[in-house]
């Protein structure tokens, strides 16, 4: 059965990616602003991906209780820098690279160190003001020495999944989706729903 999920985020790029992933799995998704005016989400915690995802999903579920609300939280973990980034990835990188090139920054950050990375995503599904399922996904791999590929943007141009030689941006869409941390979290969630 095709589900219609409402995506609880302001991030247009994240909405587009989740819509594409849901469509790939024969589901439907749309940003919450197609149903509500823009909302001021509560500040994210620094506790866990799961807590942040739950809070965002519940916040929109309170206003759209009959809808299937999904929200995620993701982060980058670098074995070369234990304790850095993680749940606070977006905030920390925004401070370190206010208007710069994040890919170039990460490429040089790991020079002479382990180039390994782990991207983690937790996605929460809320219905009727209750979190009913939590999906988890992660991608492990290495950071390339330079951007490669045109099939995607952002970190996909520097992330090489473990066991592969291509960056995510060099892969065709079905292959790339199979590796994406967010897609793996969505798939984990859909599997729990029996979809």
Swiss-Prot record:
Pfam families: Ham1p_like. The keyword rRNA-binding does not apply. The active site is at residue 73. Belongs to the HAM1 NTPase family. Keywords: Hydrolase, Manganese. Pyrophosphatase involved in the biosynthesis of tetrahydrofolate. Catalyzes the hydrolysis of dihydroneopterin triphosphate (DHNTP) to dihydroneopterin monophosphate (DHNMP) and pyrophosphate. Shows a strict substrate specificity. Has only weak activity with GTP, ITP, XTP and dTTP, and cannot use ATP, UTP, CTP, NAD(+), NADH, diadenosine triphosphate, diadenosine tetraphosphate, ADP-ribose and UDP-glucose. Its EC number is 3.6.1.67. It catalyses: 7,8-dihydroneopterin 3'-triphosphate + H2O = 7,8-dihydroneopterin 3'-phosphate + diphosphate + H(+). Optimum temperature is 35 degrees Celsius. One of its GO terms (cellular component) is cytosol. Pathway: Cofactor biosynthesis; tetrahydrofolate biosynthesis. It comes from the Bacteria. It comes from Limosilactobacillus reuteri (strain DSM 20016) (Lactobacillus reuteri). GO terms for biological process: nucleoside triphosphate catabolic process. Optimum pH is around 6.5-7.0. One of its GO terms (molecular function) is nucleoside triphosphate diphosphatase activity. This is Dihydroneopterin triphosphate diphosphatase. Its cofactor is Mn(2+). Maximum activity is obtained with Mn(2+) and activity is enhanced with increasing Mn(2+) concentration, at least up to 8 mM. Has low activity with Mg(2+) or Zn(2+) ions.
């Amino acid at each position: 059965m095709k589900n219609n999920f409402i995506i609880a985020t302001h991030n247009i790029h994240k909405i587009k990616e989740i819509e594409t992933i849901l469509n790939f799995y024969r589901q439907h998704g749309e940003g919450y602003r197609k149903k509500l005016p823009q909302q001021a989400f509560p500040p994210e915690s620094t506790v866990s991906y799961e807590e942040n995802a739950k809070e965002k999903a519940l916040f929109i579920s309170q206003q759209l209780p009959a809808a299937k609300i999904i929200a995620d939280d993701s982060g980058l973990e670098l074995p070369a820098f234990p304790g850095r980034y993680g749940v606070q990835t977006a905030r920390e990188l925004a401070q370190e690279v206010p208007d710069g090139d994040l890919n170039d920054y990460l490429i040089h950050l790991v020079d002479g160190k382990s180039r390994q990375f782990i991207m983690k995503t937790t996605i929460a599904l809320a219905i009727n003001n209750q979190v009913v399922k939590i999906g988890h996904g992660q991608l492990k791999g290495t950071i390339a020495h330079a951007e490669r590929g045109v099939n995607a943007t952002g970190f996909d141009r520097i992330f090489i999944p473990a066991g592969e030689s291509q960056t995510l941006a060099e892969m065709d869409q079905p292959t790339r989706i199979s590796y994406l941390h967010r897609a793996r979290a969505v798939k984990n969630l859909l599997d729990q729903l029996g979809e």
